[in-house]
Each structure stands twice: as structure tokens, then as C-alpha cells.
Amino acid sequence: MVKNSSVRTRKRVKKQITDGIAHIHASFNNTIVTITDRQGNALGWATSGGSGFRGSRKSTPFAAQIAAERCAEIVKDYGIKNLEVMVKGPGPGRESTIRALNAAGFRITNITDVTPIPHNGCRPPKKRRV
């Protein structure tokens, strides 16, 4: 007779981290918020589109604020208190995301703009004629 042995998976222990980095990618169409530790390992992320906004509502500052609140909710178990913010892109969700992270209880120590600027690299897209 074979005994039924239950397979136990080890419960993942969330390590306590005090300092983190918030990467905000604010494009014209969407806003992506990722919170990592100092080494760059992602702890949690959220997007405007994943927060229930679709189409042109994805690219609003309010959608970026909701995405930042959801990301803060995901990583609060890690015990992060201080955040360094890296903002990339020209989108409308740049400032509202930082305000939402501040309101979520994080102490923002540093804000850095890491938007890539070409030294006359690729040709930009043609201007829209509407």
C-alpha cells in the first residue's frame, strides 16, 4: 500500500528592506511604476493599463496616480520607508505618480530624471497632421 504524502512548498519569506528605488516610466500612452531594492531586484510593479484604464484614459495623470497607489500597496509588506525616484519619459503621469508615492507613506529622498536624450541619434517620427 502506498502512503499519500503531502508535498509542502516552502513559504516565501519577504525580507525587510528599508530603502528602495521607484522607477517611473511615463510615456504618452501609459505609465509604468516599478519599485525595486537597491540592487535593482523588482519587488512590485503596476501600470495604468493594468489598473483598469483603457484607451486614452490610460495616459491621464489620475491613471498614473492609481497605478502608483497599487504599486505601493503591493510592496508595503517589505517595510520600505525611503524611496529614491527615477523618472523616465515625457508623459503626463510624471508628477502625479511622485505625489501618490509620497501620500502612500514613503519618504522620497531623491528625484532623478533619467529620460534618454539622443546626441543626434535616430530620426524622430514625422509630425502629426490632424
Curated annotation (Swiss-Prot):
GO terms for biological process: translation. It comes from the Bacteria. Pfam families: Ribosomal_S11. PROSITE patterns: RIBOSOMAL_S11. InterPro entries: Ribosomal_uS11, Ribosomal_uS11_bac-type, Ribosomal_uS11_CS, Ribosomal_uS11_sf. One of its GO terms (cellular component) is ribosome. GO terms for molecular function: rRNA binding; structural constituent of ribosome. Disulfide bonds: none annotated. Keywords: Ribonucleoprotein, Ribosomal protein, RNA-binding, rRNA-binding. Belongs to the universal ribosomal protein uS11 family. HAMAP family: Ribosomal_uS11. Part of the 30S ribosomal subunit. Interacts with proteins S7 and S18. Binds to IF-3. Located on the platform of the 30S subunit, it bridges several disparate RNA helices of the 16S rRNA. Forms part of the Shine-Dalgarno cleft in the 70S ribosome. This is Small ribosomal subunit protein uS11. It comes from Buchnera aphidicola subsp. Schizaphis graminum (strain Sg). The lineage of its organism: Bacteria, Pseudomonadati, Pseudomonadota, Gammaproteobacteria, Enterobacterales. The gene is rpsK.
